[in-house]
């Protein structure tokens, strides 16, 4: 099994996504775990969402819409057919983000940070997974939060390596391209860490 990691700058736009496809076609994609960061400066943009959330700023909605617009443009650049399932999948991710912002009761900054910033990686891997499938590569999108188990020390969680190894062994498919997120895990209550 090979592991490739693509950082945010390498997947900041449609051309970057196409380049990842080109790299995988060149080096092979069977028995691969592809770990992908949030696209471009998405983490910074989501940190602005967090700031607006805690400040109860009227700019909260527009800061979310900026992140959404950025990702929707990449999706439009990759997929001309707006009926492609990727549009629904990305919109579902943003619906989850908006639901969290509307219903969260926790005042814990670190908890909120982990829940919100994680959407960058979740959305980027969703887009990349759909594009690889669209290009004919058998792909398994893996929510790394189901694999990497941690304690509840938000923003500085410690990994339960024994449980994590078991989860990876059980979930990762050989002979296919497994696309997942970096920097994420989840605690015993399945909250993102």
How should these model regions be labeled?
Residues 1-193:
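Nucleotide/pyrophosphate-binding catalytic subdomain
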């Amino acid at each position: 099994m090979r592991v490739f990691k693509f950082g945010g700058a390498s997947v900041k736009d449609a051309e970057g996504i196409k380049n990842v496809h080109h790299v995988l076609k060149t080096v092979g994609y069977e028995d691969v775990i592809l770990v992908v960061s949030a696209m471009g400066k998405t983490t910074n943009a989501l940190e602005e969402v967090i700031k607006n959330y805690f400040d109860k700023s009227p700019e909260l909605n527009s800061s979310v819409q900026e992140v959404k617009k950025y990702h929707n443009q990449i999706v439009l650049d990759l997929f001309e057919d707006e009926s492609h399932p990727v549009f629904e999948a990305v919109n579902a991710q943003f619906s989850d983000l908006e639901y969290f912002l509307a219903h969260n009761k926790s005042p814990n900054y670190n908890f909120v940070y982990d829940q919100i910033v994680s959407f960058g990686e979740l959305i980027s891997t969703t887009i990349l997974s759909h594009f690889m499938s669209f290009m004919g590569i058998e792909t398994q999108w893996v929510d790394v939060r189901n694999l990497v188990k941690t304690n509840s020390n938000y923003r500085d969680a410690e990994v339960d390596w024994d449980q994590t190894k078991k989860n990876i062994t059980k979930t990762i498919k050989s002979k296919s391209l497994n696309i997942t997120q970096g920097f994420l895990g989840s605690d015993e209550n399945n909250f993102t860490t």
